[in-house]
């Protein structure tokens, strides 16, 4: 149970691929102009990570070490192609918005890295959990950044959610404030870098506060030989 908890905590927070490892920055910065786009790409990446880790772990005993990386890339490319066709079939608007960044998941360092570092050494279900946790950690970072940029840039939240979730999701659109002209800095790549920097700073502050709290609540160590002395 402790191993499962550690995998989840590492993926979601301590070893977050976007906020700690800083992997996959190209799609993270390019696609997160809206919360819907960020959520769509994040969920697609999570699905790819989960299925890839599961497949790599299942086949690890029959994968020659000398050619393991090309085999991993072939597995990842197959999974990404399947996910791309699913998005094209059931969320065409999102497919058009994400564009080239769906097939680029194949080259994402997160996916290849987890296949090599974790899935090739652990069992299928733990590997699938690792992929899901890492993917949801990245999705959370994308969603927060996308929401921040959309609110500051357009004054809305979940604009275009129907392209991801269907026609009923139009009711999710919220207008935070009205603006006649968008705040371009938030919508362009410089705004994405600034937003990511703020998120990194907030995570650092939270981690530091948690360290101080643990240090304050930790019982003070008793030096050897002092036990029993008055």
Curated annotation (Swiss-Prot):
Please provide the record's keywords in A-Z order: Cell inner membrane, Cell membrane, Electron transport, Membrane, Translocase, Transmembrane, Transmembrane helix, Transport
- One BP annotation, GO: electron transport chain
Intracellular or extracellular location(s) = Cell inner membrane
InterPro entries named in the record: NqrDE/RnfAE, RnfE
Question: One matching Pfam family, short form?
Answer: Rnf-Nqr
The UniProt transmembrane annotation reads 22-42, 63-83, 86-106, 125-145, 182-202
Q: Please report the record's description of how this protein sits within the membrane.
A: Multi-pass membrane protein
* Any single Gene Ontology cellular-component annotation: plasma membrane
- Chief subcellular location equals membrane
The catalytic activity of this protein is classed by the Enzyme Commission as 7.-.-.-
Q: Subunit structure, briefly?
A: The complex is composed of six subunits: RsxA, RsxB, RsxC, RsxD, RsxE and RsxG.
Q: What does this protein do?
A: Part of a membrane-bound complex that couples electron transfer with translocation of ions across the membrane. Required to maintain the reduced state of SoxR.
NCBIfam families named in the record? PRK12405.1, rnfE
Question: Member of which family?
Answer: Belongs to the NqrDE/RnfAE family.
- Kindly provide the name given to this protein in its UniProt entry: Ion-translocating oxidoreductase complex subunit E
Which species does the entry assign this protein to? Salmonella paratyphi A (strain AKU_12601)
């Amino acid at each position: 149970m402790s191993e499962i908890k550690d995998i989840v905590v590492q993926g979601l927070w301590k070893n977050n691929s976007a906020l700690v490892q800083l992997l996959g920055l190209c799609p993270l910065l390019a696609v997160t102009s809206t919360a819907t786009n960020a959520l769509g790409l994040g969920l697609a990446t999570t699905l790819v990570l989960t299925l890839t880790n599961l497949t790599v772990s299942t086949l690890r005993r029959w994968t020659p070490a000398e050619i393991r990386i090309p085999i991993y890339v072939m597995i990842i490319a197959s999974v990404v192609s399947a996910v791309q066709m699913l998005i094209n079939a059931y969320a065409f608007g999102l497919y058009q918005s994400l564009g080239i960044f769906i097939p680029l998941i194949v080259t994402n360092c997160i996916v290849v890295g987890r296949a090599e570092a974790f899935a090739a050494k652990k069992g299928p279900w733990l590997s699938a959990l690792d992929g899901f946790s890492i993917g949801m950690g990245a999705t959370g970072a994308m969603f927060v950044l996308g929401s921040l940029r959309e609110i500051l840039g357009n004054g809305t939240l979940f604009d275009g959610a129907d392209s991801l979730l269907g026609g009923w999701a139009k009711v999710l659109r919220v207008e935070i404030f009205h603006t006649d002209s968008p705040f371009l800095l938030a919508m362009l790549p410089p705004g994405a870098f600034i937003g990511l920097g703020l998120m990194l700073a907030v995570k650092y502050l939270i981690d530091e506060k948690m360290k101080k709290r643990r240090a304050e609540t930790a019982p003070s160590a008793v030096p050897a030989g002092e036990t029993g002395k008055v």
